[in-house]
A protein has these predicted regions:
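Helix-to-loop junction immediately C-terminal to a conserved catalytic motif
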Residues: 52
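Helix N-cap at the start of a conserved alpha-helix in ABC-type nucleotide-binding domains
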Residues: 165-167
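Conserved ABC ATPase "signature" region
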Residues: 98, 102-125
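H-loop/switch region of ABC-family ATPase nucleotide-binding domains
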Residues: 189-190
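Conserved catalytic motifs of ABC-family nucleotide-binding domains
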Residues: 150
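Conserved ABC transporter NBD signature motif
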Residues: 60-70, 74, 212
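Catalytic Walker B motif of ABC-type/P-loop ATPase nucleotide-binding domains
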Residues: 154-157
Length: 236
């Protein structure tokens, strides 16, 4: 049996006296997909930043691709796709990808950029500055940037936020493609419908704890919704 792509044990993250994550246990098999739901302040983005190696746990353990999440070996295997505003607005689409490729020591960042722009349907706007893109186009460029080093594990923070229906459908299809490619996908979202359709499993965070976890699917949607609403009520 393959080792888990992600393993967390008694994971905690504190900011001063505030506990953002408390005693989180998590195991994500390689090539699987997980949706993480919860109200604002539940700890979703904090968890994702820990998985990306952008922040260190206060206590507990967190291994990604067989290494501590903040180790260079783990970070090289992870693609973090945050909000599209993380793009460089004055750089062209291609320049954004080439720059990211160089940061990740991609051998031929220009060729890799061209491949990704084609895959994301952005080949016709390769020279346009990212700041001129619609929300949907910017999200596609953000995904391309997150994939520039061909990561095994893809982390997405609220990618459906602000998208129109057409762009959201295209993104959902892209997530399914990433899954079929054998990548491990972790999706943070408020969107119950997307959480169910885009992942093998789902969990709900409430005040930094895992309040509920289940296999995703139509049969678990109602139970997942109840857990999400309970977490939202608890946060008020």
């Amino acid at each position: 049996m393959s080792a888990p792509a992600i393993t967390a044990r008694a994971l905690e993250k504190r900011f001063g006296r505030t506990a953002a994550l408390r005693g989180v246990d998590l195991e994500v098999p390689p090539g699987s997909s997980l949706s993480v739901l919860g109200p604002n302040g539940a700890g979703k983005s904090t968890l994702l930043r820990l998985l990306a190696g952008l922040s260190r746990p206060s206590s507990g353990s967190l291994d990604v691709a067989g290494h501590p999440a903040f180790a260079r070996e783990a970070r090289a295997r992870v693609g973090y796709i945050g909000h599209a505003t993380l793009l460089y607005a004055t750089l062209s689409a291609r320049e954004n990808l080439v720059f990211a490729g160089r940061l990740h020591n991609v051998s031929d960042p220009g060729s890799r950029a061209d491949v990704l722009l084609e895959e994301e349907g952005l080949a016709e706007v390769t020279g346009r500055p990212a700041g001129s893109f619609s929300r949907g186009m910017a999200q596609r460029l953000a995904i391309a940037r997150g994939l520039v080093h061909d990561p095994e594990i893809v982390l997405l923070d609220e990618p459906f936020t602000g998208l129109d229906r057409r762009s959201a459908e295209r993104l959902a299809q892209r997530l399914r493609e990433l899954h079929r490619e054998g990548r491990t996908v972790v999706l943070v979202t408020h969107d119950l419908e997307r959480a169910v359709e885009s992942a093998d499993a789902a969990l709900v965070l409430s005040r930094g704890r895992v309040a509920f976890s289940t296999r995703a699917g139509a049969e678990s949607a109602a139970e997942l919704e109840r857990a999400y609403l309970a977490a939202a009520d608890a946060s008020r």
